[in-house]
Each structure stands twice: as C-alpha cells, then as structure tokens.
Amino acid sequence: MATNQAAWLTKAGNDLEVGDAPVPTAGPGEIVVKNAAVAINPLDTHMQDVGVFVQQWPTIFGCDVAGTVHETGPDVERFKKGDRVIGHAINLVTGRPQDGAYALYTVVPANKAAILPDAISFTDGVVAPFAVEAAVCVLSLKEPGVAMPGVSTPALALPYPSLDDPVKPLGKVLVIWGGSSSVGSMTTQIATAAGIQVIAISGAHNFELSKRCGATEVFDHKDPEVVDKVVAAVQKSGQEFVGIFDAVATPDTYTSDLVILEKLGGGHLAAVHPPPAEVPSNVKAGMIFAVNDIATPVWNDFVTPALESGKIQCLPPPTIVGKGLEAINEGLKRCKAGVSATKLVVEL
C-alpha cells in the first residue's frame, strides 16, 4: 500500500515542513506520478516567500517532476502504470495540494506529460517540463491572454517545433536575453526546432551552452557594446526580426531590450516578469504565463521523439542538491542565492 509524504508550505516565508499527505488519485485526463526527482524554479521561491498563486493553506507547490506512472485516469490512453515520464505540475493554477511537485506522489495533467526515453535519467529529464511549456507559451500563442491583472501575455504566433531534420528555415530571427537560463535554453531549442534563428545573450562563460541549444550567435551581457552587436547581428542575418524574449527581465535588461527594439523598428518583447508599463507603440510587450493548453500538441507529439533524437536536450544540466523531500529547502535557498547555467534538482 502506497503512502505519501510532501514538503508542505504552511505560511508565506516559512521553510517547508515534511509531513504526511494523502496518496492522490487520478481523475479524468490525469496521471499520478511516483516522483523520482523534482526540480527548483525561480517561480517556486516566489511562491514560498510571498505566497503568490497560493489558493489554500497549507499547500504543496513545485512544477517539475520525473518518475514513474503510479495511476492513470479513466480516459487516459497515452500512459500506463510503470511508464517513465516527465511532467509539468500545475498547482499554481489549480491550487490543489495534490497538484504540487514537492511530494512523493503528484497529480499531473496527461496533456502536460511525456514518456522519458530510457537513455535519459530522471535527474536529467526533470529539468525540462516547466521550461518546455514556458517556451511554447513564449513562441506560439496567437492572441494575447492575461498573465496577471493588468498584464497581458505575449502573442508571437510562431509555429510549433518540428521533428524534421533539417528543419525548413522560417526566415525569422529572435533575440533571447538569458540564453543559458532554464527557460532561455529550452526556448532556444524549441525555436530552433521551429526553424527560427536565435541570437542569444548570456554570460561569456555560458556561450557554449547557448550554442549547444542552437543559438547561431551569442553575445556577452557584460559587453558595453552588446546592444549594438546584437542589432548588427540581426541586420546581418537578413531575417525578419520577431522581437526579444527576456528570460532575465530586470530594469537593466529592459532598458537594453527597448534600445534594441528601437534600432530594429519595433517588435515583440516577451518576458518572464511584468514588462515595462510604457513601451513605444511599435513594441508589443507581455509576460509569459507558463500554463496553457497551447502546449498540448508539443507534449503529445514532439517531446518524447525530440528527446530520443537529441532534437531537444535536457539543458542546462542539473545540479543535484540532495536526496529526499528535506533537501528541497536547501534547493530553494540556493535558487534564491542565484545559479548560472544549471537547474537545481532534488532526488527522491
């Protein structure tokens, strides 16, 4: 008989407390995953610190799981008990504790999960789920939605990634600021698989990672001439400039983003935090909200074969913080302190 434990958040600002939790059951369109690894995202630290998106207390949060299918819902056909999977847990939308990653067993929507190839470990695979859905939300929404009150989502209306090798070039170029971050790395890979040229901005020591993800050129964010160099690279590409995805999203990066956009005649500014309140009329700015069924075809048809072929890789690589639910607090602390070109992972 399975028993469940979870790392509970009882109040904003508290450390997580490991305690018993009910073993969840899978409803229609759901699977229950027996977690072998979970990952830490910056979003999780905000949920811990200020309770953003928390709908009931105590709660279980966390977005990334990898493990084996424990149970499938009555209408689920893509998965069976024992399958190795990765999944995007969506407690931040549902508010239900059983939908949080930081537990031994988690409910995951079947349309936000994929079979993990045998050649990929759980600790590698778990870096991908949240980033996959976030990347699709950066690139493929056709109409602006609501990210939070008063802030719309971006709508770049770009096509889904393709398994074709080589993929047909789309004739478009996208700049990604923060190319070595988790979402920046995956957006680079998903965009490249859609035939979009990516020019990345990252730390000088992370150039190789951005290039592994598919960026054709990478520029140092500390270079005082980075804005002019990026503008020149876009112009030299001869491609249609789509805009910028800012995976760092600070006042300093926004200042540079807007100069780049001004010099290139405008475009989209998609960001991981609320964008500047005032932007020029030729700039369409939005904040991504990384839970959207726009990603369903990518989960259903692309993720597993793309992982098998190497079309997408589990990058940036994981750093294992520790083993057991107790280690999640340490992971959250390290995430707040800042990491570069890695994703923090806890084994269970």
Curated annotation (Swiss-Prot):
Single GO cellular component term: cytosol
Cysteines engaged in disulfide bonds, as pairs: none
Entry-linked SMART domains: PKS_ER (SM00829)
Gene3D superfamilies attached to this UniProt entry: Medium-chain alcohol dehydrogenases, catalytic domain, NAD(P)-binding Rossmann-like Domain
Gene: orsE
Organism (species): Emericella nidulans (strain FGSC A4 / ATCC 38163 / CBS 112.46 / NRRL 194 / M139)
InterPro entries per UniProt: ADH-like_C, ADH-like_N, GroES-like_sf, NAD(P)-bd_dom_sf, PKS_ER, Trans-enoyl_RdTase-like
Alphabetically ordered keywords of this record: NADP, Nucleotide-binding, Oxidoreductase
Highest taxon above the source species: Eukaryota
Record-listed E.C. numbers: 1.-.-.-
Family, as annotated: Belongs to the zinc-containing alcohol dehydrogenase family.
Described function: Dehydrogenase; part of the gene cluster that mediates the biosynthesis of orsellinic acid, as well as of the cathepsin K inhibitors F9775 A and F9775 B. The non-reducing polyketide synthase orsA produces orsellinic acid by condensing acetyl-CoA with 3 malonyl-CoA units. Further modifications by the decarboxylase orsB and the tyrosinase-like protein orsC lead to the production of F9775 A and F9775 B. The functions of orsD and orsE remain unclear since only orsB and orsC are required to convert orsellinic acid into F9775 A and F9775 B.
The protein's name in its UniProt record: Dehydrogenase orsE
UniProt binding sites for NADP(+): 43-46, 180-183, 203-206, 272-273, 339-340
Up-regulation conditions: Expression is induced by an intimate physical interaction of the fungal mycelia with the bacterium Streptomyces hygroscopicus. Expression is repressed by VeA and MvlA via histone 3 acetylation by the SAGA/ADA complex.
GO MF terms, alphabetically ordered: mRNA 3'-UTR AU-rich region binding; NADPH binding; NADPH:quinone reductase activity
Enzyme class: oxidoreductase
Keyword field contains Transferase: no
Pfam family, one: ADH_N
Description of how the protein assembles with itself and partners: Monomer.
GO biological process: secondary metabolic process
Binding annotation for substrate: F130, A131, V132, E133, A134, A135, V136, C137, N292, D293, I294, A295, T296
